[in-house]
Amino acid sequence: AKTLVISFIGMQSQEVSIKPTINIVLKPDTETLDEVVVIAYGTAKKESLTGSISVVDNKKIEKRITTSVTGALEGAAPGVQVNNTYGEPGKAPTIRIRGFGTLVSGASEPLYVVDGVPFDGNMAELNSNDIASMSILKDAASAALYGNRAANGVVLITTKSGHATNKPSITLQMNQGIYNRGIPEYDRLDADRWMEASWMAKKYAMMSNKGMSATEAGQYATEHLITESIGRNIYNAADNQLFDANGKLTASRLSGYDDLDWADAIERNGHRQDYNLSASTSGEKYSIYSSIGYLKEKGYVKATDYERYSGRINSTFTPNKWFKGGVNLTGSWTKRNYNDNATGSYYSNPFYITRYMAPVYPVYMHNADGSYQLDENGEKIYDTTSPYLGNRNIAYEMLFNKEESIRNVLGGQAFATITLPLGLSVTVKGDLNNSTSNNKKYDNPKIGDGATNGGRLTSYAYQYRTVTLQQILNWNYQFKEIHNIEAMIAHESYSWERKYTSGMNTGMAVDGNLTMGNFLTNSYFNGSDDEDKTESYLARVKYNYDNRYFIEGSFRRDGSSRFHKDNRWGNFYSVGASWNMKNEAFLKDVEWVDHLKMRASYGEVGNNMGVSYYGHMALYTIDKNGGNPALLKKSLAAPDIKWETTQTVDVAVEGRLFNKLNFQIGYFDKRSKDLLFEVRLPLSAGSYPWQDKVMNLTQYKNIGTVSNRGWEISLNADAIDSKDWKWNIGVDATFLKNEIVKLPDGKDILHGMQNYSEGHSIYEFYTYHFEGVDQLTGTSLYTLDPEQKVKAEEAGALVNINGQDYATATSYAQRKWAGSALPTVYGSISSALSWKNWNLNMLFTYSLGGKTYDGSYSSLMGVSESGAAGSAYHKDILNSWNGAPAGMTETSPNRIDPNGIPRIDYYKSSDLNATSDRWLVSSSYLVFKNLSLSYELPKKWMKNLGIEGLMLNAGVENLFTLTARKGLNPQYSFNGGSDDTYVTARVYNFGLTVKF
């Protein structure tokens, strides 16, 4: 022999001439890397898999610009949905795998496993540069060994280890970027158009409420709009001389009012910097990977940022043939400044203010001529006199208020594997994770929530500890070179603990000292301890005949502290099989078939996340009654509740054809039964007649069955594969059908605008139907509830048009099914183009079908003089009804305009713009998720500098988002809701990677 072929799994093979001494450095090979994937409690060759597993390698992760590594899952695999995407600094996105298997939204999160043990921390605390791969386990065959928390899928995250080279390598990565809003704001009226719309609203309010004629109401609106409704005049005319008789603005805005857009005072261009230094080495008996990282983000909203220091050491040692051990250490320190009120309809929510503040209220105080009022230092004075804000100013408050969270995380893992005769091996692993979180919320004494009590400081302190212990016995055996058996039995114990204390003091003594001792009056102090424990026994058997037929079975028995001792244990299992058809004689010589495989599996996995830590017990709230200790019953005992169980069928075919086209087509059917739900009890059961639902008496119950079924299709092709040019294009699609199969006694459970009902999706809208606008009166019409006809007539809310009755208020309207929030199909489109050392990658994500209740648009289309004076309007309000069309009569066949916009009327706005399907809009979207360009300098240029490689890269995350309406964020939630909060950020990044 004259040549020698050197190969290693995950590395490119090399052929070299035989010499007495040979030095070989193998390069990573992403295609070969696919041969071995991380699975539950081990690894396996990809061709042997009987379950549905998608792998995201570090090459794909490195192209993405995300703080949380889970953000890289978006668009990376079929069956995976990602919402709440990158916007708030330090916030991880929300992930769903193959639908929604429970009625409790927080209980649909997948299980995250890092280096073989469950991870309960914040995913943003993991350094993405330390991640080698992520395996997404989507069916029961792949996930059943994590039985107790695998019902919603599992994401296995594997961190990097020392690589196979003959010398240490060092990698330095530096990234700088800026980011801002990735979704534009809604189209709203400017100051002049807003004034005219408000005049019209005042006019119609006088007509409907006071019975004035159109002329009288118009004159009244001109004379009283400023004094009664707006409370601010920024024009060069007297309050009662701003409009003509038709409501057209005749005055001009005073010069100097250039501070009417509150977004300018609250938002900014954010900044992102990310630095990582890693070292890797390995030898015959050891491998070591270490890294340190620093990340700093300034949010696109002022006073928000995120800072992270991270470090990791992963080491393995093999002193002899029969022993292998390792120790992994990781730690992070994070600091996050945030706004805890960045959701909802609150004056302390900056997003609420920037969206709804009418464009006639300035940020700063102005003189009568429009010029700024200045303080003794020549600085602008913040305006705290706006009637809309109730004498508050969010831009002013954000200068002084502070909300801060500091977390410290330290984790360690040690393992040892002893290889025994007869193919046996024993592995013992222990993992300990400790973290502390100290949160501080300061409200200043000058303005806002702290102004009435001299300032206040709230402190929250959390301590977490997670311990996981595993003992695993493996057996691998082969006979006659075609029979391969792998077996495993294991035991695992999991323990989670949390200690929590909080308190609030008021009355700040010394300005600027944000410690509890500097606030002299205690308002409250409380705390709690929680724990969650699981004990598990598991086993797996795999059989492979001649690399053609693969059979696998697994079993796990879990005991959870969340259930009563009589129902504590749950049994979960899976069976799967696959057929590698390419290895059959009838396909071996078919050149255009490179790979062809069929697989099928069935299994049952569990979920206990829908019940609290002590859900089976009767719980009491500890409080005071007249200054004395008191107990208030919070929930009834539920000794009969048991595990949610998800039964999954998975069938797929995959392959590669013509040495170009990779494909995978699969069908899945997940049925989750015995769903856990916290039922609020009626007064007859001992509940309390309080408005606050938190204080209602509850009891956990297993109440129903939900089905998620659909198809996953994945295609990618090597369109060009030449020496210098390579181009791979891909597309994947997931078709999902969600359905409630069973509820107790078949009874519906109404919740908000949606309804749990057999035969419908868990996120299907069930709300009042908007019939259209009466073109004679400009009134909104709704489908009448026949049982409410008499009451509607008595209230003057009944209209008969051409023989059909309609309600003019939803109090007498009928609810109807109005479509689901869930999409019909979602997926991604990708392109990877390379020419020599240049690489250009693009990723698009899309979703088709589904509806969102656009509450923000609804608020911008409604007007109300009481409680919301000065609220901004959407530009569509200009198309509202303003008088009956010519020739319109009571019997006109087109009297109802189904797409009309009702009149704007301060007095009747709550009925004209009531909650209904009028505000439902398509959730379909297309996002240019990622664009990245990189160039690797030729190695010969770097050789004399002692540099192994140097790569320059530039990228954009969330380049644009196309939706049905400008301003809409369809990825805010899975349930079709919306809020005034963070939207996806557009991130521009420039980076440099140097390898030594």
What kind of region is each of these model predictions?
Residues 252, 449, 560, 847-946, ...:
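Extracytoplasmic gating/loop element in the C-terminal half of outer-membrane beta-barrel translocons
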Residues 19, 25-29, 83, 98, ...:
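A structural detector for beta-sheet-dominated domains
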Residues 46-47, 145-147, 165-166, 180-183, ...:
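Switch/connector loops and helix/strand junctions flanking conserved nucleotide-binding motifs
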Residues 1-312, 317-326, 332, 411, ...:
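Short, small/polar-rich motifs associated with maturation and membrane association
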Residues 171-252, 720-821, 861-865, 872-896:
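Conserved small-residue
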